[in-house]
Amino acid sequence: MSDLTELTAEDKANVLVEALPWLQKWHGALVVLKYGGNAMVDEDLKRAFAEDVVFLRTAGLRPVVVHGGGPQISTMLDRLQIPSEFRGGLRVTTPEAMDVVRMVLTGQVGRELVGLLNAHGPLAVGLSGEDAGLLRATRRHAVVDGEPVDVGLVGDVVGVDPRAVVDLLAAGRIPVISTIAPEVDADGNPLHGQVLNVNADTAASAIAVALEAQKFVVMTDVAGLYRDWPNRDSLVREITAGDLAALLPSLESGMVPKMEACLRAVRGGVPRATVIDGRQAHSVLLEVFTTSGNGTMVVP
């Protein structure tokens, strides 16, 4: 039954009863959600995701949302007629493009999600990796044909100061974090106020580790991890960190950063990390509060 209105009163009660042990298990748990994929561009899925996050908070969990915004950045660059290209899987980010990245992530994607969440009450607060020194990053290069290639203002997260997020959680808020980060040198000192565009999957993983999250969830546009894509019978429901590390070299390129993020989270102390299908409405609730779960879970 796909529509809740089709359920009988007894069916609805059974749904709630099934959720009870999971409500008990996860009460008070800190959960980091990486928001992305089709759930960021489909209006119905946006609203469903916001409802899921508010449900988590109302049920006593402590959700933290981390987001990127690749499609929205590309759309704005095209609209402003700013050239954009990818090299070695990374967006070449010029200073002009970085202004757009900053504007779109913090001023558009983040604000929209905060608005959707706050439609249910004054709960969400938006911030970026720049705020209160939340993220620190160093510049990285792409690798093309085995050679390093300069891709401009693109970085890797090398440090997280979670205190601002902890304060927001203590105040009962839902932090919504956009993934840009101040550039630092090898000693961690800021470099001339420059900011870098960082991968949202890896940033979310680093934030989950720094917050000592009990759960890390990454939204994708597939049902989970497949051992032999596109063979849909090869969907993996659960995998250990060791087995995932061995499987990474054979994965489709689009899944690599997401599975690497899960691997880093689990190896960093997060008890479980899950990749879920963001194309399915309320996929977060299905993962957290049902016995069958959703997607692929990575465990130590």
Swiss-Prot record:
Q: Which organism is it from?
A: Kineococcus radiotolerans (strain ATCC BAA-149 / DSM 14245 / SRS30216)
The protein's matches in InterPro entries, at most eight in alphabetical order, are given as: AceGlu_kinase-like_sf (IPR036393), AcgluKinase_fam (IPR004662), ArgB (IPR037528), Asp/Glu/Uridylate_kinase (IPR001048), Glu/AcGlu_kinase (IPR001057), NAGK-C (IPR041727)
Q: Any idea what this protein is called? A: Acetylglutamate kinase
Name the gene for this chain. Answer: argB
Q: Which domain of life is it from?
A: Bacteria
Catalysed reactions, semicolon-separated: N-acetyl-L-glutamate + ATP = N-acetyl-L-glutamyl 5-phosphate + ADP
Q: Which family does it belong to?
A: Belongs to the acetylglutamate kinase family. ArgB subfamily.
Q: Which UniProt keywords apply?
A: Amino-acid biosynthesis, Arginine biosynthesis, ATP-binding, Cytoplasm, Kinase, Nucleotide-binding, Transferase
Q: What start and end residues bound the annotated signal peptide?
A: none
- Sites where the protein binds substrate: 69-70, 91, 197
Name a GO molecular-function annotation.
acetylglutamate kinase activity
